[in-house]
Curated annotation (Swiss-Prot):
The keyword Secreted applies. PROSITE patterns: INTERLEUKIN_6. GO terms for molecular function: cytokine activity; granulocyte colony-stimulating factor receptor binding; growth factor activity. This is Granulocyte colony-stimulating factor. The gene is CSF3. SMART domains: IL6. It comes from the Eukaryota. Granulocyte/macrophage colony-stimulating factors are cytokines that act in hematopoiesis by controlling the production, differentiation, and function of 2 related white cell populations of the blood, the granulocytes and the monocytes-macrophages. This CSF induces granulocytes. Monomer. Keywords: Cytokine, Disulfide bond, Glycoprotein, Growth factor, Secreted, Signal. It is found in: Secreted. It holds the Pfam family GCSF. O-glycosylated.
Length: 195
């Protein structure tokens, strides 16, 4: 039941962000093989994230949407945007920059969760590696197309969790936000992969 409530919250967040997921113009000059690989990676990360979410919910009982909303405000976790991916006139460079920057943000947030619990560490490590791999692939493609900025983006300010409870609550929130971000990213990549 708690997992269903969490999934409902994720869908609510995704629906709230739907204006950002408006149809894109067909302006993609990205290789099909790159797009298909990214789609596969996003689905793998989503599966890893769902597994970690279930374990966090089962282990720490922090899955009620009301708790998540309150905790989200108190922890002040940053969220990634894909606004350059949603305009009627797609900004491919801006979209790829935002995809990459969002993944870098979530890399940092996942790193901040280190030490959440010994049982969850392997699942967290896998999720972090998969996010890093996707971010690297996007960056390399941007370099190949000469779209990459002069320097790699930084992770920015990552919250410091001062207690085990905050780290566990942050884990639930970070994974939830990552799942919402990935759902939008998947829609963008799927659209770009269409002939």
């Amino acid at each position: 039941m708690k997992l269903m409530a969490l999934q409902l919250l994720l869908w609510h967040i995704a629906l709230w962000m739907v204006p950002e997921a408006a149809p894109l113009s067909p302006a993609s000059s990205l290789p099909q093989s790159f797009l298909l690989k990214c789609l596969e990676q996003v689905r793998k990360i989503q599966a890893d994230g769902a597994e970690l979410q279930e374990r966090l919910c089962a282990t720490h009982k922090l899955c009620h949407p009301q708790e998540l909303v309150l905790l989200g405000h108190s922890l002040g976790l940053p969220q990634a945007s894909l606004s350059s991916c949603s305009s009627q006139a797609l900004q491919l460079t801006g979209c790829l920059n935002q995809l990459h920057g969002g993944l870098v943000l979530y890399q940092g947030l996942l790193q901040a969760l280190a030490g959440i619990s010994p049982e969850l560490a392997p699942a967290l490590d896998i999720l972090q590696l998969d996010v890093t791999d996707l971010a690297t692939n996007i960056w390399l493609q941007m370099e190949d197309l000469r779209m990459a900025p002069a320097s790699l983006p930084t992770q920015g300010t990552v919250p410091t969790f001062t207690s085990a409870f905050q780290r566990r609550a942050g884990g639930v929130l970070v994974v939830s936000q990552l799942q919402s971000f990935l759902e939008l990213a998947y829609r963008v990549l799927r659209y770009l992969a269409e002939p």
